UniProtKB/Swiss-Prot annotation:
Encoding gene (name): secF
One GO cellular component term noted in the UniProt record for this chain: plasma membrane
Positions of disulphide bridges: none
Function noted in UniProt: Part of the Sec protein translocase complex. Interacts with the SecYEG preprotein conducting channel. SecDF uses the proton motive force (PMF) to complete protein translocation after the ATP-dependent function of SecA.
GO terms, molecular function: protein-transporting ATPase activity
Subcellular location: Cell inner membrane
Protein name listed in UniProt: Protein translocase subunit SecF
Membrane-crossing residue ranges in chain numbering: 28-48, 140-160, 164-184, 194-214, 246-266, 272-292
Subunit and interaction comment: Forms a complex with SecD. Part of the essential Sec protein translocation apparatus which comprises SecA, SecYEG and auxiliary proteins SecDF-YajC and YidC.
GO terms (BP aspect): intracellular protein transmembrane transport; protein targeting; protein transport by the Sec complex
Family: Belongs to the SecD/SecF family. SecF subfamily.
């Protein structure tokens, strides 16, 4: 039995992506500036991981229903509330932010009252600790270093596999994706916490993967078509990989949509940010990282790339 590959688009498609190069550059610059300005004015909605807060340690008489608990405490209007098991499944850590001593005591009592009235468990409150913002600053620095090292590792990989100017194209696209992702977080007031740092790193990985697929096809077509100029080759390469790109986007967006709808509050910020980042990363792979090669690549300069 013969198996046919799934294709959303015809085999021969000839859309002129490069014709929109200036428009896409202008559009991306405007969005990046808006993101910068918005972040500068409205900042981020830092979660407990970065802003500090209160940690309540509780032991219950049985394993709690964590998703239901998160839903109940999330409706109290006191901001982000993080629930985690530690030690045994009956030991529970409850974390939330507090900006004053008055709110601190009020919110602790509010949480205790809500748990007692909504759940049939016996609660033994063992400890209440304050986590200062100093820990948050250390986490911010660690998150920034993680992104920096990921950028450097990606640049080395692209330089070894292709050439330095391919790496430059991906670097510009990644900076664009990260700026827009951070701007989106600021605009939507998503909690800025460790899970959103993981989401940004996921976006970086997805965007690089998409760009490498197109770059591979560009290199292959440079070997095949000696008389075509670089603009024609980039257009051809994007069109040839477009069906794969669309299928990948659809499947990953559907998976993220399921996480947004059914994953619960614990991974909501992560799922929404990755959903947005997949769209932005796909756009940047087609309209930024590939077209930017025209600034560097010509037939004479391509020799090293073709031979690799």
């Amino acid at each position: 039995m013969q198996i046919y590959p799934l294709r959303l688009l015809p085999n021969k498609i000839d859309f002129d992506f490069m014709n929109f190069k200036k428009v896409s550059y202008t559009f991306s610059i405007i969005l990046s500036l808006i993101s910068f300005i918005w972040i500068g004015i409205y900042k981020f909605n830092f979660g407990i991981d970065f802003a500090g807060g209160i940690v309540i340690e509780v032991r219950l008489d049985q394993a709690p229903d964590l998703p239901k608990m998160r839903g109940v405490l999330g409706k109290l209007g006191i901001g982000e509330v993080v629930l985690q098991n530690f030690g045994s499944e009956r030991d529970l850590s409850i974390r939330f932010g507090s900006n004053s001593e008055e709110n601190l005591m009020k919110n602790i009592e509010l949480i205790k009252g809500s748990l007692q009235s909504n759940f049939p468990y016996k609660f033994e409150y063992r400890k209440v600790d304050f986590v200062g913002p100093q820990v948050g600053r250390q986490l911010i620095e660690a998150g920034a270093m993680a992104m920096l090292f990921s950028f450097l590792a990606i640049m080395v990989y692209i330089w070894v596999r292709f050439e330095w100017y391919f790496g430059f194209g991906i670097l510009i696209a990644l900076v664009h994706d990260v700026i827009l992702a951070l701007g989106f977080m600021s605009m939507t007031k998503l909690d800025f916490n460790l899970s959103t740092i993981a989401a940004v790193l996921t976006i970086i990985g997805y965007s690089v993967n998409d760009s490498v697929v197109i770059y591979d096809r560009i290199r292959e077509n440079l070997r095949k078509y000696h008389k075509k100029n670089i603009t024609e080759i980039i257009n051809l390469s994007i069109n040839e990989t477009l069906s794969r790109t669309i299928l990948t986007v659809i499947t990953t967006l559907l998976a993220n949509l399921a996480l947004i709808l059914f994953g619960g509050e614990a991974i909501r910020s992560f799922s929404i940010l990755v959903f947005f980042g997949i769209i932005v990363g796909t756009y940047s792979s087609i309209f930024i990282s590939a077209p930017i090669l025209t600034m560097f690549v010509n037939r004479k300069f391509n020799k090293k790339v073709i031979e690799r």
